[in-house]
């Protein structure tokens, strides 16, 4: 790596610590939620142009019909655009995106990037709730700005707990993954825990800088409180059902117990996935 490239990375990481992350995210959130016709049209047009958003696959193909940028960003897709693998033994991708990392949880540690990892206990935010996933399997899926931003069930199960864990709001990308220790266990997140026929399963929705919010079907839109909040539920959700959505998106991490599933060998870091695609299978 050249000196210039290394310097740029170092400055980018340092800037993450200097920027008022939560205040900036709140400001962006207000703009994203605005229903002012001129403002929301301008923001949607700029975003659509910059990221090449394909509205031909969206349920609502007219950008002017969305009531706010948030409404546009969390847009539904047309029926049939994403097909959920119906094989009963399949584990499917919870979202459109790219695999950041995938594999086994080793000695309670989840691999983040070269030289970086984080403990599953810190990710979940509760030692007892994290215990079933020690030595289990994980997959981290990053949702880019241009992706479909709803998160779906990777396997059928009953939602038993949600755990809001407050935290920082570092940007999520390859640079921060490689340089911010414990990135995903430090950022604000919503942990969703399930009982399944395979045992326990977790889907963790991780926030990031300028993410305007996280929403789940059980809790509605999360209202940051600055403290850990545990809620109990009894909500059955089938594989492929919507679980939640990101407002300006980030990352979904799925966890399974040891010796319950196996990932398809073709998947590795940076593999592109779409919601409903087979990523693994039960053992």
UniProtKB/Swiss-Prot annotation:
Q: Where is the active site?
A: 96, 152, 250
Q: Does the keyword Lipid metabolism apply?
A: yes
Site Cleavage (non-hydrolytic) — annotated at 249-250
Q: Which gene encodes it?
A: psd
Q: List cofactor names only.
A: pyruvate
PANTHER family (alphabetical): PHOSPHATIDYLSERINE DECARBOXYLASE (PTHR10067), PHOSPHATIDYLSERINE DECARBOXYLASE PROENZYME, MITOCHONDRIAL (PTHR10067:SF6)
Known catalytic reactions: a 1,2-diacyl-sn-glycero-3-phospho-L-serine + H(+) = a 1,2-diacyl-sn-glycero-3-phosphoethanolamine + CO2
Stated name of the protein: Phosphatidylserine decarboxylase proenzyme
* EC numbers for this chain: 4.1.1.65
Q: How is it modified after translation?
A: Is synthesized initially as an inactive proenzyme. Formation of the active enzyme involves a self-maturation process in which the active site pyruvoyl group is generated from an internal serine residue via an autocatalytic post-translational modification. Two non-identical subunits are generated from the proenzyme in this reaction, and the pyruvate is formed at the N-terminus of the alpha chain, which is derived from the carboxyl end of the proenzyme.
Location in or out of the cell: Cell membrane
Function noted in UniProt: Catalyzes the formation of phosphatidylethanolamine (PtdEtn) from phosphatidylserine (PtdSer).
Q: What class of enzyme is it?
A: lyase
**Residue positions where Pyruvic acid (Ser) is found in the record:** 250
Q: How is the cofactor bound?
A: Binds 1 pyruvoyl group covalently per subunit.
Q: Domain of life, per the record? A: Bacteria
**Where is it found, in Gene Ontology cellular component terms?**
plasma membrane
Query: What InterPro entries does UniProt report for this protein, alphabetically?
Result: PS_Dcarbxylase, PSD-B, PSD_type1_pro
